């Protein structure tokens, strides 16, 4: 039995991780975020009520769950407070159930200003960041000049460190990007306003999680974004700034890697991507590519980013990219989401290989974005189905063509599909194998 489960995306993000984490946390004591920031967007629908979380772990809607933000997360105090308010208005005791590592780097206004100024300067070569300061905050962390949650315990020392780092960033903003400087006084006053709140939620995350493990408590690690956006293993440079893969769990939470039991990879029954970067099976981008099937996927699937509101690019399921994700994460089983979006399509295609310019065929996706952009997808065509799968709760409720599609994905990837999502509500799910019971 796996007491410690990792839930992560195996595509380009937006796979539906939030719903699945919420579903599985019925049996969990802890839900831990270990990377990313408020660039994530996890949408939960419970009894018809929609909740979008960007920073707070998805387990916050469960009374039995303690939520933890690990050291691998870059934390925006402004975003956290904004997210806490509507939850507390609904009677959810966030301050009693949310805990933060003192080692979390802070995202401050100058990070946001720097992020946005850079994207403007890149012009047509823009990466497509959310503009929320994630990348610059991670840069400061690696450069060892970043401020962390723990620095808020000593505001006098915080003020000195802040002044030094802001001189560095403001010089770049004004002289290189021709943007306005960020006010030191305003940033400091804001920090004084939230210091007490943040420090009151600080715990020793490593010690807390290790004690939970020894007690036999079930722990869920909630990933953000997706494997193909990983800073090291994704389609670089069109990636995020953190390790979105299973390897990021230990580093981003301080939890021993040997204790991780089950890796649940979340994948849509098709593919989507937000922002720039290669996408071999792309059908629709709202501009140059206007395939009607791709438009169907985007419209029926409501493919707009929960964080940015941007239209997602859509395409066929890519088993080649999925094999890379399986290698990197040692995926135990899949959760296939949005199966119901495929309802009504006469035929479906699955990418089974990439043909290169020299005629060779790749069965696993390449590392570099440049190589990705040169591949031609090789497709296998399968019959679709006209029946309605929305809300199905058992395999018996699915048409045979849908079952065949799922089985083919299992054959092509070598990994079982243990969970199938057929709608946005936590109840609209088929659970073949429960990760905590595997």
Swiss-Prot record:
PANTHER family (alphabetical): ADENYLOSUCCINATE SYNTHETASE
Cofactor: binding comment: Binds 1 Mg(2+) ion per subunit.
Cofactors required: Mg(2+)
Keyword Cytoplasm recorded: yes
GO cellular component: cytoplasm
Catalysed transformations (reactions): IMP + L-aspartate + GTP = N(6)-(1,2-dicarboxyethyl)-AMP + GDP + phosphate + 2 H(+)
Keyword tags: Cytoplasm, GTP-binding, Ligase, Magnesium, Metal-binding, Nucleotide-binding, Purine biosynthesis
Class in the EC hierarchy, top level: ligase
EC number: 6.3.4.4
Subunit structure: Homodimer.
Lineage per the UniProt record: Bacteria, Pseudomonadati, Pseudomonadota, Gammaproteobacteria, Vibrionales
Designated name of the protein: Adenylosuccinate synthetase
UniProt cross-references to Pfam families, sorted A to Z: Adenylsucc_synt (PF00709)
Binding, Mg(2+): 14, 41
Record-listed IMP binding positions: 14-17, 39-42, 130, 144, 225, 240, 310
